[in-house]
Curated annotation (Swiss-Prot):
Belongs to the shikimate kinase family. The keyword Nucleotide-binding applies. Catalyzes the specific phosphorylation of the 3-hydroxyl group of shikimic acid using ATP as a cosubstrate. The lineage of its organism: Bacteria, Bacillati, Bacillota, Bacilli, Bacillales. This is Shikimate kinase. Binds 1 Mg(2+) ion per subunit.
Length: 188
């Protein structure tokens, strides 16, 4: 598929962004099931292709290498695939090339939640599994959370997750997508 090709809305990949631990993978799997699409967790795909976990990749090859692999994969998926649900790692969308490809070729949903909710509900579940959090104080993690918000603000739609269960968030995304299809491509 050429970069100049305009992808019909109904065929565009649906891309989920947000801070680590927001629930992108869980919600993405639910959305994929509801829309009968394939689901791709970008971090899991990187692990599969590299033959090692993300923490191992960070330790052995460094963050710069990981970000390069991540960027190349996401840009390729955005420009050369259709009808997928993509879940991006929390830091992926900070890269300009990734943002540009996602916004141009997909429908980007920001899965948002407050710092307080994330700190109380999500941090305890993920703190040991995320290389970016390793050896960071709570204040440093909070700073990282708020630094990323400006990149996440560049999206097509936002879902606030604070009080939503994953199923409710997925349903909200699906309803939003279907409404968009009906309004902008009613005869397809």
């Amino acid at each position: 598929m050429s970069r100049q090709t305009t992808i019909p809305l109904r065929e565009r990949n649906i891309i989920l962004i947000g801070f680590m631990g927001a629930g992108k993978t869980t919600i993405g799997q639910l959305v994929a099931k509801k829309l009968y699409r394939d689901f791709i967790d970008v971090d899991a795909e990187i692990e599969r292709r590299q033959g090692m976990s993300i923490p191992e990749l960070f330790a052995q090859k460094g963050e710069a290498y990981f970000r390069k692999v991540e960027r190349e994969l996401i840009v390729d998926l955005c420009t050369n695939t259709r009808l997928k649900i993509l879940s991006l790692g929390g830091g992926a969308y900070l890269q300009e090339d990734v943002r540009r490809a996602c916004l141009a070729h997909g429908i980007v949903f920001f899965l948002d939640l407050s710092w307080e909710h994330w700190k109380e509900e999500r941090l305890p579940l993920i703190v040991d599994s995320r290389p970016v959090l390793k050896n960071k104080t709570l204040e440093e993690v909070e700073q990282l959370f708020f630094q990323r918000q400006s990149a996440y603000a560049l999206h097509h739609s936002r879902v606030v997750l604070n009080e939503l269960e994953a199923e409710q968030a997925a349903e909200q995304i699906v309803e939003s997508i279907k409404w968009t299809w009906d309004v902008y491509e009613p005869n397809r």
